[in-house]
Amino acid sequence: MAQESDQRSRPGRRWVRRTLTTLVTLLALAVTATSLIAYVWQPAETRGSRASPLSQSRYVDTAVARFHYTRTGDGPPVVLLPGGTLWIHTYRDVIPALAVDHTVYAVDLPGNGYTTVHDDDFSYDLPAMTGALREFMDAVGLPRASVVAHSLNGSVALSFAWQEPERVDRLVLMAPLALDTDLNPNLRLMRIPMIGEAMTKLITEDLYVSGLKAAYVHRERLTPETAHAYWVPLSRAQNREAMWKQVRNLDLSLVDRHLGQISAPTLVLWGERDTVVPPWQAKVLGSRIPGSSVYVVPGAGHNVHEDDPVTVDAHLTAFLHPTPTRRIG
């Protein structure tokens, strides 16, 4: 009887073994494929014009990188830092407004746009990115300037402001990554070894643009031409690598614990309907930075300066104007 029972159970055990073997094989194949994508395969770059439509592109070489930037206008200097995956084209509405009475330097930091890092081992962490901003300002002869930063590079601006307060006149933070709290799910995925590398290589223009739309409430402002202009430099191998490196190496505790040491007059701008970095952080950030001002832009998303350029430009020009008593109505 026991022998008959054993014979009946053998097919079941064989099925379990075959199933487990198949699952292990499929898992091994998936890991191998992901590893090849992450560390071997290199997607093609999309070719396109490198010239900024704002003004003539300029380049300056430093020990860190060959920085791509534009210089527009005349007056007290302002440095503009684009957010992650964007480049200085994002400030196409801001630059003309500020250039009326400022010298505006819009610069692609390492990982942005058409700046090229010289060192393949550049870490893209906060100390490295802060040092890169310092190198750029030194290279173009700026001992001191106001700094405007968006999103991911808001953390860089804050790091620079507390480390070198004598070099920051005024500080504007637009939906910055600044508080040591949970990142959004996509950014958390990029922090996982091999997954982040594979994700950034598998991103296509269509996938990128689909995700980028989440940064806008007024999505008609993200025209096909603008979306393509953002994608072209992002498809560069160095910028794909920077995507996961900057997120994975980002230690927001370095920024969070020094917020009370920011001495520059600071303006915090945030889109009311930001789904990338939640707008509740605006009030918290404002309470942590001494003497800062906070304005939440109604009906705007994460790319607040593109979603509502009229409102943002008004606040920027009022805050940065050479006559500090100027106010907007």
What are these regions (language model features)?
Residues S292-G329:
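Catalytic active-site module of serine/aspartate enzymes centered on a nucleophile-bearing elbow/loop
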Residues T72-Y114:
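Conserved HGGG/HGGXW glycine-rich cap/lid loop of the alpha/beta-hydrolase fold
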Residues A63, T70-T72, L109-V148, L152, ...:
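Active-site loop/oxyanion-hole signature of alpha/beta-hydrolase fold enzymes
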Residues W162, R170-M199:
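Flexible "cap/lid" loop of the alpha/beta hydrolase fold
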Residues G48, L183-R188, L202-Q261:
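Conserved alpha/beta-hydrolase catalytic His-Asp/Glu region
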Residues I262, V268-W270:
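Short beta-strand/loop motif that positions the catalytic acidic residue
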Residues R273-V277:
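Acidic catalytic loop of the alpha/beta-hydrolase fold
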Residues M1-P76, D101-H102, L142-P143, H321-G329:
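Alpha/beta-hydrolase fold catalytic core
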